[in-house]
Amino acid sequence: MDVTIDATQTDQKEPILSYSGHGADDAPLNPYKNLITRVALYVMRVNDIKSFPTGVRIHVRNDIPFGRGLGSSGAAVIAGLLLGNELGELNISRDRLLDYALMIERHPDNVAAALIGGFIGSYLLELTGEAAATTQVPLSEVLPEYPENASESWGYDPPVPPQGIGHYIRFGWAKEIKVIVIVPHFEVLTAEARRVLPDMYSKKDLVFNLQRLAVLTTSLARSPPDVNLIFQAMQDRVHQPYRKHLIPGLPRILASVTPTTHPGLLGICLSGAGPTILALATDNLQHIA
């Protein structure tokens, strides 16, 4: 994201937005409709800055396809937080910015990774009382829609994020491991991907996943990577079995693409809710893709 401010352009009251890359034709250029600039305005208004500085021009280069399980909305939220922090010269810490992000995204998985970078584990603190109530404020009050006839003070008093909503840790990552993403030309709605998940799981399936998660987070930091350990630790019973019918060919891919058939492969899985498929590998990247 490139941002320039020309304070001499006193007749330009609102930011001028432009886009390139994925979604460029569909991204709203109205700063009161665009997610990135709405988030930036939220940050500034929480800190008593009523409006954008004059003469702001923003160009967004987006390399993340929308609706593919790659966390595009989380990345946009973080871009907006960083933009608001810079425009308002607020010097908000990284950990505090995560609190702001969680008022919008409501779960830390994507926003923590986008903000911190690297291989991240995260969780939400269980809040009580007023702090818990604040995090449940409808998103429409955090990022209000701006009608055409909205006054300048519309949405000026947004909720202030409680302190310490989200917590994270950065895991180690072996230098040999590379990430491959295979991005289909169709979308899977996150709401639909969540809807197909069951409300209850068997204890056996949860234990299966938790055991492997504990092994996986450590094994990905070991150098050289243990192929068999990582491949087995990436097996899943919690979400892929229920979402596989949303992605044509996924069951066949998961069953047939292995370290034996594709040397260099460490493991393969859905990226987020899909439909993107993510593979970890050390070699033969083009062949695996």
Specify the residue positions occupied by each region the protein language model found:
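ATP-binding N-lobe of GHMP and related small-molecule kinases
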Residues: 1-68, 82, 86-92, 127-128, ...
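Short beta-strand-to-turn element immediately C-terminal to the catalytic PLP-Schiff-base lysine
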Residues: 6, 114-116, 120-126, 162, ...
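Solvent-exposed alpha-helices and their adjacent loops that cap or buttress functional pockets
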Residues: 49-52, 70, 104-105, 112-114, ...
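Beta-strand segments within the central parallel beta-sheet cores of soluble alpha/beta enzyme folds
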Residues: 54-60, 92-103, 232-233
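DPxDG-like acidic metal-binding loop motif
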Residues: 70-94, 114-125
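Active-site glycine-rich loop that binds ribose-phosphate moieties when present
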Residues: 99-106, 123, 127-172, 199-201
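Active-site rim beta-loop-alpha module in soluble metabolic enzymes
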Residues: 180-245
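Glycine-rich, charge-dense phosphate/pyrophosphate-binding loop(s)
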Residues: 220-289
